[in-house]
Structures are given as C-alpha cells and as structure tokens.
Amino acid sequence: MAKGQSLQDPFLNALRRERVPVSIYLVNGIKLQGTIESFDQFVVLLRNTVSQMVYKHAISTVVPARNVRVGPGGGYVQSGSDTLQINDDEVE
C-alpha cells in the first residue's frame, strides 16, 4: 500500500463501518451529504436518498458529523475540523 493512503483508507473505513454521516466538499464548492457506503482507490460511494459515485480527485474535504477513531490505539478526527489528530508514530 502506498504511504499516502496509510491514513486515508482507515479514516474512510471507520466512517463506513460506523455509518457516520459526513459532509463532502468538492473542489468546485459543492457540498454533498450522506454516509459512505463503499470506496476504492479512485471513488467514494456516498449514500443519501440515492447512491452517488464521487471521484476522489474531485473531493476537497470530508467532514464527519462526530469524532471518529482512526485505527487501533490511533488518534481521532474531530467533527467540523480540518485537523487530523493522530499518534506521532503514524506520521513521517
């Protein structure tokens, strides 16, 4: 796995597994809301009244509605914050 995805995948997986409502802001300013149904290397499947496939390159920010733990013994991501707080040993 690429070093750049060592935080992205656990974060998205925690949001998916816990069904945390998220706001996803796109690079063009559009705000999408829903829960993450699935994701892969290139897309996120967002579910609200319908499922939407959103390309990751179009995503600017993912904001969870509540705090989410990232990884076992890892830090957390605060809701409404652009700051990720994680253990120092996970960051190079």
Curated annotation (Swiss-Prot):
<feature type="domain" description="Sm">
    <location>
        <begin position="9"/>
        <end position="68"/>
    </location>
</feature>
<keyword id="KW-0694">RNA-binding</keyword>
<dbReference type="GO" id="GO:0003723">
    <property type="term" value="F:RNA binding"/>
</dbReference>
<comment type="similarity">
    <text>Belongs to the Hfq family.</text>
</comment>
<protein>
    <recommendedName>
        <fullName>RNA-binding protein Hfq</fullName>
    </recommendedName>
</protein>
<dbReference type="InterPro" id="IPR047575">
    <property type="entry name" value="Sm"/>
</dbReference>
<comment type="subunit">
    <text>Homohexamer.</text>
</comment>
<dbReference type="GO" id="GO:0006355">
    <property type="term" value="P:regulation of DNA-templated transcription"/>
</dbReference>
<dbReference type="GO" id="GO:0005829">
    <property type="term" value="C:cytosol"/>
</dbReference>
<dbReference type="InterPro" id="IPR010920">
    <property type="entry name" value="LSM_dom_sf"/>
</dbReference>
<dbReference type="Pfam" id="PF17209">
    <property type="entry name" value="Hfq"/>
</dbReference>
<comment type="function">
    <text>RNA chaperone that binds small regulatory RNA (sRNAs) and mRNAs to facilitate mRNA translational regulation in response to envelope stress, environmental stress and changes in metabolite concentrations. Also binds with high specificity to tRNAs.</text>
</comment>
<dbReference type="InterPro" id="IPR005001">
    <property type="entry name" value="Hfq"/>
</dbReference>
<dbReference type="GO" id="GO:0043487">
    <property type="term" value="P:regulation of RNA stability"/>
</dbReference>
<keyword id="KW-0346">Stress response</keyword>
<dbReference type="GO" id="GO:0045974">
    <property type="term" value="P:regulation of translation, ncRNA-mediated"/>
</dbReference>
